Amino acid sequence: MNVNLEEILDIYENIIYKNSRNKNKLYNFEKNKMSILYDLCYKLNNNIYDIGKYNIFLIKYPKYRIIMSLSVTDKIVNHYVTIKYLIPVLSKYLDNRNIATRKNMGTDYGIKLIKKYIEINKKYDKFYILKLDIKKYFYNIDYVVLKNMLVDYFEENVYDLLCKIIDSTDEEYINTRINVIKSNVNSNKVNDLPCCEQYKSLPIGNMTSQFFAIYYLSGLDHFIIHNLHLKYYIRYG
């Protein structure tokens, strides 16, 4: 890889620093910021970077979810590979009706599409809107399938880094921590919170996870739109 300090510093200052809610993390990072970033560049350029452990916690709004939060350094890498590699290389394979977490798209764009589709179909006496949801989608993303979808598009060192990110939840401490959280919450809602199966599941919250999720079912999007000819279609997630 050819990672330069300016790119890494820009991601930290304009994305991580501005959007992080954990000010203690930032405070500790700031004390040795430049030395940490120099070290990170060295590790990435020499293919010796490894992902640290996740901070795993529960959120209750808008619904109960397990969140896995990376360290500041790992968040920088996560954003870097998404911005530098995933989006530029893979976006051309995504249909514009696949709208989640994409620039100039998202929920507002989805609402516009729905309104447009309804107006178009008002010429018919009757039409239907079908809404489907994939249960525990992020937890059911298969590592092997996802890696096979990536391997032909990236150089070996970039692909290896992407695989490290994908594999980062395949660790025993993850489920141990999830089970501790569930045991400490007095609510039936935690019963539906899944643990991570071996070779499956992406952490909710990572930028890479968000992009992997929209890319993972891109083949399904094309099948529905072009093979089934269902052109009034939107996928969010």
Predicted segments, located by residue:
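Active-site-proximal segment of RNA-dependent polymerases
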Residues: T82-D142
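Active-site-flanking structural segment that lines cofactor/substrate pockets
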Residues: S35-Y64
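Non-catalytic, well-ordered alpha-helical scaffold segments
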Residues: E6, M34, Y38, D74-H79, ...
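Conserved polymerase palm-domain catalytic core
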Residues: K122-Y236
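Short Gly/Ser/Thr- and Asp/Glu-enriched loop/turn motifs at secondary-structure junctions
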Residues: G52-Y54, I234-G237
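Conserved pre-motif C helix in the palm subdomain of viral-like polymerases
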Residues: K63-N96, C196-N227
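Glycine-/proline-rich flexible loop or hinge segments
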Residues: I16-Y27, F57-M68, D95-R97
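Non-catalytic, polymerase-adjacent accessory regions of viral genome-replication enzymes
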Residues: M1-N46
